Structures are given as structure tokens and as C-alpha cells.
Amino acid sequence: MTHDNKLQVEAIKCGTVIDHIPAQVGFKLLSLFKLTETEQRITIGLNLPSGEMGRKDLIKIENTFLTDEQVNQLALYAPQATVNRIDNYDVVGKSRPSLPERINNVLVCPNSNCISHAEPVSSCFAVKKRANDIALKCKYCEKEFSHNVVLAN
């Protein structure tokens, strides 16, 4: 029996590959982190087969590298993700997101009375690890929410 080990998503010469994104989360990451606001080529793989996860999403962004802050902000959506730095088609660095203390300019406060909806301010949430959950506390209204509530917003 032979195995077909072809790449299902084309390799990139230089840039970032975000791998092991839970299935159905890839598009959310693209929009929340404004990854599409670039002139660079972006390749997206959705519902790809994965031995570990069953199915996964994958994002490849050419000639773009994520900051440590951006990598860590992925932890809310894709805690098992691997962020690979690619140079000349080789993986030259790997990192995994770890939960940051704060998340800025990404999420929207679910409190409709929060000042962040009416004023031109950047969103800011403090991240707090709980026993079975992650809580996010808005800097402006000071209300605390389960991360699932904020992510669904």
C-alpha cells in the first residue's frame, strides 16, 4: 500500500503558517486579527484532515510575520495552534500561543452600554484564567465575561 503525501495547501517561500487551528475557526481568526488587510497572498485550508484533531484549519500568509503579542492572542481561539516562521521554504522558528495578560484592539465588548461602543477607543480586555474557563474583563465598563460570550460577539 502506498501513501499519498502531497501537500494539500501550497508551500510558501517566506512568511507565517498558522497550523492546528480548530476546524471552523480559521475565518474568524482572519477577520478578528485583520489578517486580510494586506497585499500579500494568503492561503487558507479549511476542514483539512488531521491525525490529532480529526479536522483542522490552516492559514499561510506570505512575507508577513506575527508579533509575539499576536501569536499569544491566538490562544483564546486556537490554544493548540502552532505558528511557524518560514524562510526559503524551511521552518526557521516555531511557537505556540500562551494566554496573554491583555488583549487589545481585537475583541468587542458584549455590554451594549459600554463606552467602547460610542467612543473612538481601542478595545482592551484583561485576561483571567479560571478553573474551567477564561474570563475577560473590559477596561472601560469593568464587566467580566466568560471568553465564550466575548468570542461569540
Swiss-Prot record:
For this UniProt entry, the molecular function terms from Gene Ontology, in alphabetical order, are: metal ion binding
Which Gene3D superfamilies has this protein been placed in?
Aspartate carbamoyltransferase regulatory subunit, C-terminal domain (2.30.30.20), Aspartate carbamoyltransferase regulatory subunit, N-terminal domain (3.30.70.140)
Entry keywords, A to Z: Metal-binding, Pyrimidine biosynthesis, Zinc
Q: Name one GO biological process term.
A: 'de novo' pyrimidine nucleobase biosynthetic process
Indicate yes or no for the key word Zinc.
yes
Q: Where does Zn(2+) bind?
A: C109, C114, C138, C141
Report the domain of life of the source organism: Bacteria
- A Gene Ontology cellular-component term: aspartate carbamoyltransferase complex
Q: How is the cofactor bound?
A: Binds 1 zinc ion per subunit.
Cofactor(s) essential for the protein: Zn(2+)
Q: How does it assemble?
A: Contains catalytic and regulatory chains.
Entry's HAMAP family?
A: Asp_carb_tr_reg
Matching PANTHER family, A to Z? ASPARTATE CARBAMOYLTRANSFERASE REGULATORY CHAIN (PTHR35805:SF1)
What protein family is recorded? Belongs to the PyrI family.
Job of this protein: Involved in allosteric regulation of aspartate carbamoyltransferase.
| NCBIfam families listed in its UniProt record | ATCase_reg
Name of the featured protein: Aspartate carbamoyltransferase regulatory chain
